[in-house]
Swiss-Prot record:
Annotated ranges, domain Toprim: 260-341
CDD domains in UniProt: TOPRIM_DnaG_primases (cd03364)
Cellular component terms per the entry's GO annotation: cytoplasm; DNA-directed RNA polymerase complex; primosome complex
Enzyme Commission number: 2.7.7.101
Gene name per UniProt: dnaG
Taxonomic source organism: Staphylococcus aureus
EC class name: transferase
Stated name of the protein: DNA primase
Cofactor note: Binds 1 zinc ion per monomer.
Residue positions binding Mg(2+) 1: 266, 310
Length: 605
């Protein structure tokens, strides 16, 4: 789907970024700009800046920002099209969406919307059946006995599917919906012998399952009579994909951002009870393991995740497996260990809301501390396990991003191995495996475990540490940003592959795409051409970098010559690569680059 560019431009021109951001951030004027606490991460010192002149915002802490569309996308976790539509409504500009591909693609989008509409429409009748009918009385009593108040039932949209094979079927048919589409949406099942349709959910308490935008895309039907299965969920559909959905994310997102932490539970019933008790940053998967898509969503909100699974053997095993994976993905992982045999719902039922929130606040351990406490008996009595887990825990602690949290974990873990914190710290340093060499892709590289590493963002502070060649690349790009004629005059003069700084290389390509559609460079428009926070950071930093007046004669040509230097690499470049090889621990590469530097120095003598 595509929105006409003229509409996008009109909405952008009518939306003042200062007014928009002020709805979410308390801003104070500092010079020509405005500054406030970043809405995307927790901070005590303001680092979020808004430029009224350039109509952009930027956080120097988490690197997020952009123009009005990108700010709206990030703050509401929505797509670009949704952001344009929302801002269009804000400034009374009608958004005309046209198809850019085939009519079938438009039909797919239309079908998805109808599936959501069916789910939301039937929810009203499920709620009515639970709260207003005789048939729903037993299910309602069941909920009330388990602490569900009328207000909570209404807030969560909980309902009841009557014990009828055609309640949902007949209702949707009367409303004019395609029954085959209702089947594809997961609301109906089908008899494969005669292809007749019937209700998937019968005689069950119905819990709506929502996507990140708060739209109902599926259901979980819970039995209250002992029938199996205990929970019957919607099947995988175009709008309901378990690997992409986290229960309660729509409600918890704001608290997750504010607290800079997400708490992962095992089931949605635990989430509802925990949220009611006052723990607002809680989510759960839909009965599946945490997927890479889930982790991607979580990364957008916070780098801190706390696991609070059931206090049984299965919960412990799941905590160890999930925590290990999250740690290797670069997240700070913590664990809340519930008493044996209890889940959050049971803990709240036994001890109450206040005791639960106090417990959660005071009983949070690092993943390394939790892991060693689980394995302590084996460590104490099995020398082979002692050595194995010492290496494992050393590695786990080395993966932690915060040096403060690392030291805390060292202090907590060391006693389990009967060593001092200093000895454990030395062991961590000793056992850090040298990284294997993984070639960098266009945006970054890979660590020794094959994990993706994003490139270092080029912020203003880092501009002071650029090599001679990178400084030439920076100045060259800055001149190209001045006007389209300069860009056209010099675009063919350099080979993009000669850029040593990968961020600058892609800015060069962005400028090509930008000037193909625009005559005058504007940072607020240019940031729409990038999807990466790192590249957006580079564009904004280049915008803030000032050249000294007009270029002197042949100045730009001099930059071109530096960028296009042929032959062997400069010593400066080789030194840079040697430092990188040292950083990743590749001994062979270190030897190679050192030999090149020695040879280069001999040539100079």
């Amino acid at each position: 789907m595509r929105i006409d560019q003229s509409i996008i431009n009109e909405i952008k021109d009518k939306t003042d970024i200062l007014d928009l951001v002020s709805e979410y951030v308390k801003l104070e004027k500092r010079g020509r700009n405005y500054i406030g606490l970043c809405p995307f991460h927790d901070e005590k010192t303001p680092s979020f800046t808004v430029s009224e002149d350039k109509q952009i915002c930027h956080c120097f802490g988490c690197k997020k920002g952009g123009n009005v569309f990108q700010f709206t996308q990030e703050i509401k976790d929505i797509s670009f099209v949704e952001a344009v539509k929302e801002l269009g409504d804000r400034v009374n500009v009608a958004v005309d969406i046209e198809a850019t591909q085939s009519n079938s693609n438009v039909q797919i989008a239309s079908d998805d919307l109808q599936m959501i509409e069916m789910h939301e429409l039937i929810q009203e009748f499920y709620y009515y059946a639970l709260t207003k009918t005789v048939e729903g009385e037993q299910a309602l009593t069941y909920l009330q006995e388990r602490g569900f108040t009328d207000a909570l039932i209404k807030e969560r949209g909980i309902g009841f599917a009557p014990d009828s094979s055609h309640f949902c079927h007949d209702f949707l048919q009367k409303k004019g919906y395609d029954i085959e589409l209702a089947y594809e949406a997961g609301l109906l099942s089908r008899n494969e012998e005669n292809f007749s349709y019937y209700d998937r959910f019968r005689n069950r308490i119905m819990f709506p399952l929502k996507n990140a935008q708060g739209r109902i895309v599926g259901y979980s039907g819970r039995t209250y009579t002992g029938q199996e299965p205990k929970y019957l969920n919607s099947p995988e559909t175009p709008i309901f994909q378990k690997r992409k959905l986290l229960y309660n994310l729509d409600k918890a997102r704001k608290s997750i951002r504010k607290l800079d932490e997400i708490v992962l539970l095992e089931g949605f019933m635990d989430v509802i009870k925990s949220d009611t008790a006052g723990l607002k940053n809680v989510v759960a998967t839909m009965g599946t393991q945490l997927s890479d898509e889930h982790i991607t969503f979580i990364r957008k909100l916070t780098s801190n995740i706390t696991l609070m699974f059931d206090g049984d053997f299965a919960g412990s095993e799941a905590t160890l497996k999930t925590g290990q994976h999250l740690l290797q993905q670069g997240l700070n992982v913590f664990v809340i260990q519930l008493p044996s045999g209890m889940d959050p719902d049971e803990y709240i039922g036994k001890y109450g809301n206040d005791a639960f929130t106090t417990f959660v606040k005071n009983d949070k351990k690092s993943f390394a501390h939790y892991k060693v406490s689980i394995l302590k008996d084996e460590i104490a009595h099995n020398d082979l396990s002692y050595e194995r887990y010492l290496k494992e825990l050393s590695h786990d602690i080395s993966l932690m991003k915060s040096s403060i949290l690392q030291q805390k974990a060292i202090n907590d873990v060391a006693p389990f191995f009967n060593v001092s914190p200093e000895q454990l710290a030395n062991e961590i340093q000793f056992n850090q495996a040298p990284a294997n060499y993984y070639p960098e892709d266009e945006y970054g590289g890979y660590d020794e475990y094959g994990g993706y590493i994003e490139p270092e963002p080029i912020g203003m502070a880092q501009f002071d540490n650029l090599s001679r060649r990178e400084k030439a690349e920076r100045a060259f790009l800055k001149h190209l940003m001045r006007d389209k004629d300069t860009f056209l005059n010099y675009y063919e003069s350099v080979d993009k592959d000669n850029f040593t700084n990968q961020h600058f290389k892609y800015v060069f390509e962005v400028l090509h795409d930008f000037y193909a559609e625009n005559d005058q460079y504007n940072i607020s428009d240019a940031v729409q051409y990038v999807n990466s926070n790192e590249l957006r950071e580079t564009l904004i930093s280049l915008e803030q970098y000032n050249l000294n007046g007009e270029p002197y004669e042949n100045e730009i040509d001099d930059y071109v010559n530096v960028i296009n230097e042929k032959g062997q690499e400069t010593i400066e470049s080789l030194n840079h690569k040697l430092r990188e090889a040292t950083r990743i621990g590749d001994v062979e590469l270190q030897k190679y680059y050192l030999q090149q530097i020695v040879a280069k120095n001999k040539e100079r003598m």
